[in-house]
Amino acid sequence: MSTLTRFSVRPLATMTRHLADVASGRAEPDLVIKGARVLSTYSERILPDREVWISGGRIAAVKPAGSYRGSAATIYDAAGGLIAPGLVDPHIHIESSMVTACSYAEAALLNGTTTIFCDSHEIGNVMDVAGVEAMLEDARQAPSSIFLTVPSTVPATSPELETAGGDLTAEKIAALFDKWPEAVALGEKMDFVQVAMGDERSHAILAAALERGRPVSGHVYGREFVAAYAASGVTDTHEAIDREIADDLLEAGIWLFLRGGPPTTPWHSLPQAIKTITELGASHKRIAVCTDDRDADDLLLFGLDWVTREAMKAGMKPEQAWAMGSLHGATRFGLEGDIGGLGGGRRADLVLLDDGFKPVNTWYGGELVVENRKITPLLDTALSNRYRYPEAAYHTVKLPKAVKLTPELPTARVVAHTIRTELPGITLGHERITLEPSNHWQDHFDRHGLCFVAVVERHGKSAGNVAHGLLSNFNLKRGAVASSVGHDSHNIIVAGTNEADMQVALRAIEEAQGGVCVVMDGKVTAMVPLPIAGLLSDKRVTEVAEEVKALKVEWEKAGCSIPYMGFNLIPLSVIPEIRITDKGLVLVPEMEIVQLFEAA
């Protein structure tokens, strides 16, 4: 186990007398960062000519330049650079990055993020409580401060609509809160329709958190649901996609986490939602920024620091944007006394920024872990001693020996309920297409821009459930693509133009015990193996990033119209309008299954 963890810094309650002595000059600090400008997230000002005194991994004081006259402290000269608090990401899913918590920490620290709040519902959907607790153990050994928002919607809907590996009941969630101190909130309550309609299971889960004084995170689409959602105790959401619903949510007392992501992905809603501030005049005091989902490649390129700079581009002052990226997330979860600012007693989680507000150095608990944009030997050693997941996590893809992945060709005129994909890939259209009698599927593909899609149950909980569907506008012209990260139940989703290539893709994932792949002419052209729960790699984030880059190249060659992370969302049966799970095609507004074909 690494000695560079959240627990390396003692609790403030055990350090107050010592820190008071250091701040008063009666004791020497361990480290003094001199020659700095300081970004205060409390007053939202940049203060010139300051030095930061650090002892025992905590800030003793921020003082005027030249205050330190001792001789025992290590001196770091910031040379006029800007010191700011480490960033705090209030909503992420580590599993989306396809790396473990320890590996995730490497990318986060390179980007100046020192604290994250993780909803581990992905691994919970595969391995139930055992998966959540394995990730908590992983997080405890990581060189980062990782808190849990307990998964609230596992499965995302109901056993009638999909088969998940996990089933986190109110009783299991209550037990997680009672056992794990770092379980600080209830994770995003995605089944917002059920919450609004008063579903008994959903409200029992809400009660498990509220009875213990834990805040509830949300996930809601549609202004018509906001009032009931807020009345049910939900007090934050990251799903505000435009200024109108953002304004509704603020007025309902719900914190906003503005989600930023690469514009080619489904996660870049910040530019529209931030207009509640820049156009409608709302205060930014209950608004933070978050990343939500990143793959390993994008995690290195588009961290929370990038999202914070996007807020600046959208009209926020740098001091405001950095507060939204640090103090506000900490405040939402009641941890502003420990992180999010440079006040006395806070953890010494700091970043040195260049003039473009890009992190150059990162200190975690007073230890220099990133210097000149490269990890230090101290961090490299910590990252080399990663947590080993339980053996059961490496055996979660359980498929029948034979499964048919394509539907029978209709012999009569029918109406097909197809799934229309559109950029960026979050919402999917329900498109009814009339298919005339034909002897070949290729005729329908050419005429209507279709391809096959199937979802195969992989948890070993059914007799080999497989559902068939048709994608329109996906633009896959040949071959197949497949993923074991089919949100949120994480069954295997396969799309293709022919049964043979789809079978190759399915079996490649089975052999690797998880992954994302592209197949052309019977050969796997790209593969990201994900052997831990079918979701995570056991490699360093930089290695996984290279595998993801290669996958993206082949994905683009295949012609797919949405990125693979959008493809992974196709089974997510809580986002309109139509989805496919292992049980069939789900009409989301009605929460019911419809057959692929009906008589014309």
Swiss-Prot record:
Cofactor: Mn(2+)
Protein name: Adenine deaminase
Reaction it catalyzes: adenine + H2O + H(+) = hypoxanthine + NH4(+)
Keywords: Hydrolase, Manganese
Signal sequence residues: none
EC number: 3.5.4.2
UniProt cross-references to Pfam families, sorted A to Z: Adenine_deam_C, Amidohydro_1
Organism of origin: Chelativorans sp. (strain BNC1)
Similarity comment text for this entry: Belongs to the metallo-dependent hydrolases superfamily. Adenine deaminase family.
Keyword Hydrolase: yes
One Gene Ontology term of the molecular function aspect: adenine deaminase activity
GO biological process: adenine catabolic process
Gene it is expressed from: ade
Hydrolase found in the keyword field: yes
